[in-house]
Amino acid sequence: MRGDNVPDLEREAASCEGCPDPAKETAMIDKVLLEQAWKTVRGAVRWTPLLHSDYLDSVVGARVFLKAESLQIGGSFKMRGALFRVSCLSEEQRRHGVVAFSSGNFAQALALAGRRAGVPVTIVMPGDAPQRKIELTRRAGATVVLTDHGTRNREEVASERARALAAEHEYALLHPFDDPLVVAGQSTLMREVQVDARRDQMHIDAVLCPVGGGGLIAGTALAEKHFGQGAEVIAVEPEACDDMRRSLISHRRERNVGTPQTICDAMQAVSPGAVPFEAAEHLISRGITVDDGAVRRAMRIAFEEFKIVLEPSGAIALAAALERRDEFTDRTLVLLCCGGSVSIEDLLRLTSSTH
């Protein structure tokens, strides 16, 4: 791994002078911005490994590599987008502080990025978010506000509360995925994969990417467009919330009704974000889904074969490779294992019954 020591983000902010206004059109997520994000983020995060197993290759019938982003600072890929977004704040925004809504991973990442930059952070989280994620966000230094969503979508309710707090306290309102600067930050994950692949003279045929709001897959697809070798980028979602798959078919953003029931709690967005969907719709080849049982089995295999802990959302790409193996015969796959924020109690509960 590289870059375990995160530098002072007040100094790093200088590298983001001239950052575009996130409110403007998504055409700004170009090669120049992606390079800017790469220069800012690559020395401020862990360079997470690509893991390989001959056993997994034999099971899937393909050459399979896991990008173990569960080992990232903060436990997920969200650290990349949070670091770059915070580095682009104005001095006035830094003084007032920031607010965001999140079910957990962006919450912790933004809290850590804000603490290192000296920026006050308030996070609005659903009251039913995993207790472990709430505790870790508070431990990272953020003020946490919990919401009760009732029968409504929990992300929608948390988003409304965050907007109200931003207006009341003059906080900068940051979105966990619907922001071009966050998307650019997330693109650095795929940049690492590309560097490692070139070093090992490996041609990647397909990248299986988890999708919640779409920030990671948009960054991945854009990085592959500008710096890659033409790998197919495939969206992976739980059966219960396949809004990206449906959106790719209809060519418009489809919504989930209520809060989808799935163990993949980090993937319960209302719909794909406008920014990531517009930026990457034409770059994503297709969407596929898997059920929660497949995710449970993938979590167990990740632990037993690779000795890594994945949360459900972090294991879903592996689940797709295993469950839909006939689609990937003799190909070289990279599975983006995007996070590992799960308590030991939940890990044992979710993996003890994998029928």
What are these language model-derived features?
Residues 11, 18-355:
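PLP-dependent amino-acid enzyme catalytic core
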